[in-house]
Amino acid sequence: MKWQRVKYQPNTPLGANGQKVTASKAHTELSKQAAKEGMVLLKNENSLLPFEKGTRLAVFGKASADYVKGGGGSGDVTVSYTVSLDAGLKALSDYVSVYEGLSSFYNKNVRDQYERGVAPGMTVEPEVPAELLKKARAYTDTALITICRFSGEGWDRTSSYDNGVESGEPMWKESQKVFERGDFYLSDAEQRMVETVKAAFPKVVVVLNVGG
């Protein structure tokens, strides 16, 4: 038996001419507006944000390429495309510029991990090559660190206090391998990346692409 609900979709709106308007230009603009209103500025020391026009950025973290658009299950709907943080910044080339060396490094690393069969959101933070770090610092004095987290219907953020509570969700077990103290905290690899970037750059911004 196949599960069919095509005739029972009260959330499939129709336009005045009877055509579906889901994913229309109007809906895309509405989604963009909702995303903007859902962003929260947690801290802005020395008024580093917003970036001045012409700012050069060295973007660090696998989250620059591994964009989390929603949680697992019904929260992660099928879409025609997504825009990663890296691609989004590049689309603003009239305003900021991104160091291409790091962009290529993270995009390739994330792509390679998924080709090896890594589950969504379970990619591991790669170590930044010393030579690449040196070139990025020569490019700019401003770094942008990206961190992402994925959650789903059967599991959510965990901490070291949750180690004794096991979920039946397979992804929960995968998460324990990647995030040593639970994914409320930085993994060891993420912590090393953050400390490395902080030591090399005088100006650092952190972007959290997280759910839960």
Residue locations for each model-derived region?
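C-terminal non-catalytic regions of proteins with extracellular/luminal or membrane-system context
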Residues: M1, V6, N11-G212
